[in-house]
Amino acid sequence: MDDFLSISLLSLAMLVGCYVAGIIPLAVNFSEERLKLVTVLGAGLLCGTALAVIVPEGVHALYEEVLEGKHHQASEAKQNVIASDKAAEISVVHEHEHSHDHTQLHAYIGVSLVLGFVFMLLVDQIGSSHVHSTDDPESARPSSSKITTTLGLVVHAAADGVALGAAASTSQTSVQLIVFVAIMLHKAPAAFGLVSFLMHAGLERNRIRKHLLVFALAAPAMSMLTYLGLSKSSKEALSEVNATGVAMLFSAGTFLYVATVHVLPEDTSTNQSGSSLSPRPLPSGKN
């Protein structure tokens, strides 16, 4: 029951913190120039948190259990070993197992990131092909970008929720707090970046609030579903394959796709078009 109470409180704090961080751009009236600056800031926060927070935290969560296990094995070996030759033999065995585990973890890192990126690529392609089948593809393209950006961040937040639910299933408070802090460190900038991007794209404020609410609800809902849906055997199996780290790296792949493929190119293209269009009316003599 303590685990359920803790995951409930963490989910509630995640929901409130994410929504409050995302509502800040809506609560302040920005001019057009300041809105561009806020949008660029949001895009920078998305890319920066993807590279500087999510990927390192996912790798740390992936390696943490193995490193703790090796530490316990080393302490037990020091207590139980009597002869020096036996100690040397056991250290060689531990070193071999350590290198074997590291090669497996390296594979987990790359595969999880690539799967997250490719998953969002497929979602993007399916969504864009569906939108381009409408009557006006030119006007449909910006709306597709808005929907894909929100959908990508919602998928990323859902993967974060799975990571938190898997961490809560381990019954280790320290692991839960580490994962929660890591998620909040990038969910708040992500909410800010999402809202600023949608404002810059011209979406109505009521619809922006709905997008923000869906994004804020995704991680808490998935964390509760993951925690409640896991059986005891499933929890043991997830702890063996480091599901927390794998889920965080998968979410990092989805986050990287949204930040680098949609938000950042959209901002740079609009800024370049605005700067290139401003001096052009001067040399032209046509009215």
Curated annotation (Swiss-Prot):
It is a multi-pass membrane protein. It comes from the Eukaryota. GO terms for biological process: bicellular tight junction assembly; intracellular zinc ion homeostasis; regulation of cellular response to testosterone stimulus; regulation of vascular endothelial cell proliferation; zinc ion transmembrane transport. The keyword Cell membrane applies. One of its GO terms (molecular function) is androgen binding. Residues 273-287 have a biased composition (Low complexity). InterPro entries: ZIP, ZIP9. The chain crosses the membrane at residues 4-24, 35-55, 107-127, 147-167, 177-197, 211-231, 245-265. The keyword Nucleus applies. Its main location: Golgi. It catalyses: Zn(2+)(in) = Zn(2+)(out). Pfam families: Zip. Residues 268-287 are annotated as: Disordered. Signal peptide: none annotated. Glycans are attached at N29, N242, N271. Keywords: Cell membrane, Cytoplasm, Glycoprotein, Golgi apparatus, Ion transport, Membrane, Mitochondrion, Nucleus, Transmembrane, Transmembrane helix, Transport, Zinc, Zinc transport. GO terms for cellular component: mitochondrial membrane; mitochondrion; nucleus; perinuclear region of cytoplasm; plasma membrane; trans-Golgi network. It is found in: Golgi apparatus, trans-Golgi network membrane; Cell membrane; Cytoplasm, Perinuclear region; Mitochondrion. Belongs to the ZIP transporter (TC 2.A.5) family. Transports zinc ions across cell and organelle membranes into the cytoplasm and regulates intracellular zinc homeostasis. Participates in the zinc ions efflux out of the secretory compartments. Regulates intracellular zinc level, resulting in the enhancement of AKT1 and MAPK3/MAPK1 (Erk1/2) phosphorylation in response to the BCR activation. Also functions as a membrane androgen receptor that mediates, through a G protein, the non-classical androgen signaling pathway, characterized by the activation of MAPK3/MAPK1 (Erk1/2) and transcription factors CREB1 or ATF1. PANTHER family: SOLUTE CARRIER FAMILY 39 ZINC TRANSPORTER , MEMBER 9-RELATED, ZINC TRANSPORTER ZIP9. This is Zinc transporter ZIP9. The gene is Slc39a9.
